[in-house]
Amino acid sequence: MTLHDVTATVPEIGIAMIGSGLMAKSHTMGYRNVESVYGSTPFRPRFAVLADASEDLARRGAESLGYARYTTNWRDALTDPDIDIVDIVTPNFLH
């Protein structure tokens, strides 16, 4: 019997989340569950950076949602070479 690793060929995409409120939770859950809705996908999400103006909210959001790093400066996410997608979930008046 030969075991084949189907995850080895699926590239990861680095996600940066700008904002840490309800929509950050909702979007993160969506990324986590995309395969359960659509089946096999050509990528696997990697939760790289969460940004929020409040350091406390950024830290707590990153910890609770599973992001590897956090920042209080959204520009850090834009210039990070590990980021493929920037998801802006700030309040409407901020985007």
Segment roles from a protein language model:
Residues 1-65:
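N-terminal Rossmann-like dinucleotide-binding module
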Residues 54-56, 65-95:
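Beta-loop-alpha module in the N-terminal Rossmann-like domain of NAD(P)-dependent dehydrogenases
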